[in-house]
Every structure is written in C-alpha cells, then in structure tokens.
Amino acid sequence: MGLERVVVIGLGVSGRSIARFLAQKGVCVLGVDKSLHALQNCPYIQEKYLENEEFPSQVDYVVRSPGVSKEHPWVQAAIASHIPVMTDIQLAFQTEKFTERESLAITGTTGKTTTILFLEYLFKRSGIPAFAMGNVGIPILDGMQNPGVRIVEISSFQLADQEKSYPVLSGGMILNISDNHLDYHGNFSEYFQAKQNLALCMRNPDDLWVGDERFYGHLYLEEVQKYMRLLDKESALKPLYLHDKHNYCCAYLLAKIEFPISETSFIEAVATFNKPPHRMEYLGQKQGIHYINDSKATTVSATETALLGVGNQAIVILGGRNKGCTFSSLLPALRKAAKSVVAMGECAQEIARDLEEFPVTVVKNLSEALLCAEEQAVPGDVIVLSPACASFDQFRSYEERGAMFKHLVGMEEVLL
C-alpha cells in the first residue's frame, strides 16, 4: 500500500480519522476540504486541495467523509474516471482486524444512538467487553482498535456507496425506515436502498434482523413484541416511552445472536440505563407545566414517535432547517396529542402552510417559541421541543439547540 495515492474528502472528525489511518499504513494522503484551516490543521496529509481546485492525477481511490454528498464535484470526478469511492465503513470492513471477533451493526432512521449505547451497556453489565463506535461519536477506524465486541452505528450516508460485499458482521439490525435525509439522497427510494445495503456486510444473511414491520412484515421479529410484553409486566420499571421499549428489545435480540444474556439481566439493564440527552428528556415542571427536550428529533418520523408519549395536551415546538420532508404527515399525530404548534426558524412558514388545518403560531427563534408556548400553556400541559428539522439554520447542532432550550427553561434551577 506504500505507493498508493488516496484522496480523503472532508477533514472533520471522521475525515481526520480516515487520514490518520491511511497515513499509518504508509499511504500518500491527499486531503480536500472547503476550509483552508481544516487543511492546514490536519498533519496526516501530504497534499492539500481546496474543493474548488482541479481533481489530481494518479489517484488509486477516494474515501469521502460520511457527510460528503455523492454529488460532491470530487466524488463525481472520481466516478467519471472509474476511481473507486468509499467511506470509512468500507475502509474498515476491508481490514483483517474486522474478522477477528464479533461485530454488530445498527442502522435506522431514528433511535440508533440510544440503541447502540444501551447494547454496549447491556454487554458491559453482563461482563462482556464491548465498545460502541461509528456514527455514535468514535470514528470506526479509531474504535475498532479497542477490545471486545464491536458495536457499530452506521448511517445511510455511510451505506450509500456499499456496492461490494464485505461479510464481516456477525449480526445487524435495521431499526426502522422513514423519510429522512432526502436533501442528501434525493428521494426515498435511494435512502431506502442505502439502509438495505447493510445486508451486504453480513457473514450470515439470516442474522440481519428488522425492527420495522411496515416495510418488512415477513421479516419482522415476533420476539420484539414478546420482550416488550415482558417489560410491560415489570411494575418496578420506571415508565418507558413506546419507542424506547422497542429499541431496547431490538438491542437485546441482537445481543443474543452470540451471547446467552438472561432476561433478568436484560430487565436490570433497562432499569438502570440512562438515555443520552435531548431524546424525550423530561426536564421537570414549573407551575404545573411540564417540559420535554426532544431536540434530537430532526425528522418528521421522529416527532411522530415522540408525540405517542406526551398525552393529549401538548404544545409542540417545530422548526429549523427542513431535510426534504413535508410536515402534513404530522397532522394525525398532532390531532391526538397536541393542542397547538409553535413554528420557528427557517421553515416556519412552510410548517404553517403544511399544517394549515391545525393551530400554528409562527415565530423567529427558539426563545420566542418557548415564550409563545408558555403564554398558551395551562397547568397540566406539556411543552415539548421536537423540531422535526435539522438545527443548522440557527444552531451548530441539535445538542446546542437542546442545551439552549434547557437553559431557557431554566433547567439549571430546581424545577420540581
């Protein structure tokens, strides 16, 4: 590999991980980014290019960071020149290390991170070394060096290029599929196909399981329902949202492919697991009004799921940057769960048009949205931030948006 010349497109967290991995293998790394600062601060690249420069010659293959679109001009230039294009997932799956021990992967539209982290927690609590990596935060090329079971969160961005078969996974789960990232994939068919590409990574195709009966009724696991009923019988458990129960049960089924973890251990793990923040995070109540931070709900389907767990007196804060979805599909869930909507941000007017049959107030930003919601609320109501949109119109991330909501609510103070 020492003579290979490899282009890495995008030098964020994943891109730097890719460049570091390749440099350690003796590859000549050519880095490309829209930011000169990113290029200057990546010590692993031998040649630096801004993305508006011409595609270089004598390139063996291209590795794009997960967030870099297949329509990127350098990706298109590589394809036109019949140069292979891949992501860090394919690069990792080609290494011998990935066949040395058990590796599990989860993809889906919503719930991936919570499910991955619960699965890691379940393993560790059962005395089984495990390490979560991939889209969950630790790039796969860094995380695969850790001991124990590999648990990989894979996004549709990373699966979109999956054309070859890399049979390295001992188990896989497609949690669910609904409209998402259509601004990236172009249409639902392309997004749907990207998720299904996980099948190309399985050692045994029978160990790819599906948690969504809408698209895979014949493959849907009856065991999911069985273990959800098991959790329902456990009166000692704290109340669980329906989607959380579903995700925990999917994780348990995936764990049991290789390890005989008991139902008792599973129930104890559910009882003691703390979800990551910004996912139907109950903040408390003030003057009888309850507050929920669901900033992670960046899709219409995620908000639909959230509305299943908020009763029927919710004031829902929607808005941000649309990811290519329509909001009218929220109407059935809103009619059951909400009394009104406050629409904010870049696509607030679009939300108001799509939901014209429902009470909607349009505001500029999150601060105004919370103030408007509180003016409408009475004791017993729930104000829930579940935007159904990306955050990038006004925030750097959904985490920043959620943190701002918590600050505005006054979570730092005693709310109960």
UniProtKB/Swiss-Prot annotation:
Broad EC category: ligase
Sites where the protein binds ATP: G108, T109, T110, G111, K112, T113, T114
Organism name: Chlamydia trachomatis serovar L2b (strain UCH-1/proctitis)
Family: Belongs to the MurCDEF family.
Domain of life: Bacteria
Stated role: Cell wall formation. Catalyzes the addition of glutamate to the nucleotide precursor UDP-N-acetylmuramoyl-L-alanine (UMA).
Alphabetized NCBIfam families for the sequence: murD
GO cellular component: cytoplasm
Signal peptide annotation: none
SUPFAM superfamilies named in the record: MurCD N-terminal domain (SSF51984), MurD-like peptide ligases, catalytic domain (SSF53623), MurD-like peptide ligases, peptide-binding domain (SSF53244)
PANTHER family: UDP-N-ACETYLMURAMOYLALANINE--D-GLUTAMATE LIGASE (PTHR43692:SF1)
Protein name (database record): UDP-N-acetylmuramoylalanine--D-glutamate ligase
Reactions catalysed, as given in the entry: UDP-N-acetyl-alpha-D-muramoyl-L-alanine + D-glutamate + ATP = UDP-N-acetyl-alpha-D-muramoyl-L-alanyl-D-glutamate + ADP + phosphate + H(+)
Listed GO MF terms: ATP binding; UDP-N-acetylmuramoylalanine-D-glutamate ligase activity
Pathway: Cell wall biogenesis; peptidoglycan biosynthesis
Enzyme Commission number: 6.3.2.9
Localization in the cell: Cytoplasm
GO BP annotations, alphabetical order: cell division; cell wall organization; peptidoglycan biosynthetic process; regulation of cell shape
Pfam families with a match to the protein in the record: Mur_ligase_C, Mur_ligase_M, MurD-like_N
Principal place of residence: cytoplasm
Gene3D superfamilies in the record: Mur ligase, C-terminal domain, Mur-like, catalytic domain, NAD(P)-binding Rossmann-like Domain
Keywords: ATP-binding, Cell cycle, Cell division, Cell shape, Cell wall biogenesis/degradation, Cytoplasm, Ligase, Nucleotide-binding, Peptidoglycan synthesis
